[in-house]
């Protein structure tokens, strides 16, 4: 994976996490990093960052909760979109944990290992031979979520444009 794609995945990881004051405060720094990315990815990220900077924090939090927490079709636990509650999902979660551990990656949040921001952060820092299979494994789910977000005209759709 080239450095540009790593940067994109790292930025999207940060922007897909629950919005707090620290995210809003760091928007200008994130915007500088996004400005270094060529092409359409830059424009999509800058469009989302414009929304982030113009929207009051409480409204950002309400939109995030309404979009990802109250809508099962958009939950950020990516294996749910592939397997639902099937036992294969449990196997996938165990495999993700194993992948993280073998790569020396510390899961530093209280989410399940399939939490999309965590997967994206991992892909942005891990060796290509480890991250590329995850992109391949869940690329269809990234596209599906992007399509669903576009259908409801969510500002978060811009972030999924750069993942596929």
Predicted regions and their residues:
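Charged, alpha-helix-forming regions
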Residues: 1-115, 121-164
